[in-house]
């Protein structure tokens, strides 16, 4: 159980900015975070949807960069910057365990 808990901490740290590009994938969290998320309401109103988790790096994007660095803060890049319930609900579940 302790090993699993440590694994969850590492995964959460990676989403919050302890990763190869030093970027938080939760908008509004940290100093470097997604500002151009793929979310229709946020795009139209030009607001930062604080607390939303985006997908992060996409190893399938054609680039010379290593897979963990294939991330662009661009609202047209839905594979890296989309806000989806299947990203955000597990994050809420894991963070609730850290109380």
Describe the predicted segments one by one.
Residues 1-99:
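Aromatic (Trp/Tyr) and acidic
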